[in-house]
């Protein structure tokens, strides 16, 4: 089985290409994701991405987290996906459209010569109704709501970018018990489908710093949907302007919540390697 490894700001993915046809005997994809994403016994990655044909868009992206769970969307993953299908010649038009569980997204490639140097994604409108995030608390939107974690109280804003996010504003990371609070909020009963968790420091009205605990993946170097949700939350709380640079451990994303109520994300997509999986890796 051939694979390609890609990353968006260090948020890394193993790609399996079924665009031109899947094998007769399909693998157990959740189990395959757990094996391949393992940092010691597999390839290593935050997720497994399948490249599939679509009758609604130019291609369909299916993604599985490193624990085998299937999220609705992944911002860094879809940038890598767009570059991959363009470079493979599966699409020639620009912009292009990709089908996901969160709907059909439009992506604009920045191309210099014959190289894709960046990808701008129309992430759609943020979902702010509590039952659609979903979060079991009253409020449309849920802004400045209170959350109890092991006796410690936090204020949060709930946003969905096709997948749920709990955004918290903090003063620093030194006093934050990230490894305890992150997973506790991810699995908090207020979030029936679990949630991604973003811890945000506001640097200025045009800059945020973000640390993320991803649902199903844990700490990652970047989260595109999380960066989008964080800017929406920051605007709702009156902390930033609508166009913001978000600093993540893996690098920067430019996020804009447009006056058309759509969120736009711009960032890189890079290759790591391509190779062939041996039978030992699949057994």
Curated annotation (Swiss-Prot):
Keywords: Amino-acid biosynthesis, Cytoplasm, Isomerase, Lysine biosynthesis. Pathway: Amino-acid biosynthesis; L-lysine biosynthesis via DAP pathway; DL-2,6-diaminopimelate from LL-2,6-diaminopimelate: step 1/1. The keyword Cytoplasm applies. Its main location: cytoplasm. One of its GO terms (molecular function) is diaminopimelate epimerase activity. It is found in: Cytoplasm. GO terms for biological process: lysine biosynthetic process via diaminopimelate. Its EC number is 5.1.1.7. It catalyses: (2S,6S)-2,6-diaminopimelate = meso-2,6-diaminopimelate. The active site is at residues 74, 223. It comes from the Bacteria. PROSITE patterns: DAP_EPIMERASE (PS01326). The record marks 165, 214 as: Could be important to modulate the pK values of the two catalytic cysteine residues. GO terms for cellular component: cytosol. Substrate binds at residues 11, 65, 75-76, 163, 196, 214-215, 224-225. Pfam families: DAP_epimerase. Homodimer. Catalyzes the stereoinversion of LL-2,6-diaminopimelate (L,L-DAP) to meso-diaminopimelate (meso-DAP), a precursor of L-lysine and an essential component of the bacterial peptidoglycan. Belongs to the diaminopimelate epimerase family. This is Diaminopimelate epimerase. It comes from Desulfitobacterium hafniense (strain DSM 10664 / DCB-2).
């Amino acid at each position: 089985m051939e694979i390609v490894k890609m990353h968006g700001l260090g948020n890394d993915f193993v790609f399996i290409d079924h665009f031109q046809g899947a094998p007769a005997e399909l693998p157990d994809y959740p189990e395959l994701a757990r094996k391949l994403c393992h940092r010691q016994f597999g390839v290593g990655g935050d997720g497994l991405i399948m490249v599939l044909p679509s009758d609604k868009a130019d291609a369909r992206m299916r993604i599985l987290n490193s624990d085998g769970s299937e999220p609705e969307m992944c911002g860094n993953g879809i940038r890598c996906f767009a570059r991959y299908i363009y470079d493979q010649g599966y699409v020639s038009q620009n912009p292009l459209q990709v089908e996901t569980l969160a709907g059909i997204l439009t992506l604009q490639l920045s191309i210099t010569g014959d190289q894709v140097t960046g990808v701008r994604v129309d992430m759609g409108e943020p979902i702010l109704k509590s039952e659609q995030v979903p979060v079991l608390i009253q409020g449309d939107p849920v802004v400045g709501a209170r959350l109890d974690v092991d006796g410690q109280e936090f204020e949060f804003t709930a946003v969905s970018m096709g997948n749920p996010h709990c955004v918290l504003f903090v003063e620093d990371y030194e006093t934050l018990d990230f490894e305890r609070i992150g997973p506790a909020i991810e699995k908090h009963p207020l979030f029936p489908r679990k949630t991604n968790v973003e811890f945000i420091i506001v640097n200025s009205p045009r800059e945020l710093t973000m640390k993320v605990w991803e649902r199903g993946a844990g700490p990652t170097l970047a989260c595109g949907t999380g960066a989008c949700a964080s800017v929406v939350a920051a605007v709702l709380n009156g902390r930033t302007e609508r166009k913001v640079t978000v600093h993540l451990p893996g690098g920067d994303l430019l996020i804009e919540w447009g006056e058309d109520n759509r969120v736009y994300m711009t960032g890189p997509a890079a290759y790591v390697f391509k190779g062939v999986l041996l039978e030992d890796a699949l057994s």
